[in-house]
Amino acid sequence: MGKMIYLMGKSSTGKDTIYKHLLQWKEIPFEKVVLYTTRPIRAHEKDGREYHFTDEVHYQELFKAGKIIEDRVYQTFYGPWRYFTVDDGSIDLQNQNYLVIGTLESFVKTTEYFSKDQVLPIYIEVDDGIRL
């Protein structure tokens, strides 16, 4: 049975660097969980690689269908942007291991959706003097 490793921590603690290194490990193969977002795509991004880019209408359809595992919304200058994980059939914890970067709140919701046995937390903490 696979596991989902959930990396968490404050900004600038090295989560992205650790994430990239772990994805390169061959001893423990990890798959990426590609999140969804309603924010606009940026010039260097590709749909399905960094995120699945969608809109509020599609989010509402997924929500009504019970497909949203966890979601967060941020109020921006441009309006609300959602980031969310969807049960779209791409997560197969029976046969694969996954690596995710998220918040404590998204970890809790993901654990409630799957189970404590399948979603394992790693909280990265770095002294503020080093981090900043």
Language model features with spans:
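Hydrophobic anchor at the beta1->P-loop junction of P-loop NTPases
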Residues: 7
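The conserved Walker
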Residues: 10-11
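Walker A/P-loop
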Residues: 15-16
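The feature captures the helix immediately C-terminal to the Walker
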Residues: 19-20
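Post-Walker A helix-loop "phosphate-sensing" segment adjacent to the P-loop in P-loop NTPases
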Residues: 24-32
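ATP-dependent small-molecule kinase phosphotransfer cores
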Residues: 37-98, 102-104
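Switch/connector loops and helix/strand junctions flanking conserved nucleotide-binding motifs
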Residues: 42-44, 108-110, 128-132
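Conserved phosphate-donor/acceptor-positioning beta-strand/loop module used by diverse small-molecule
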Residues: 97-103, 114-132
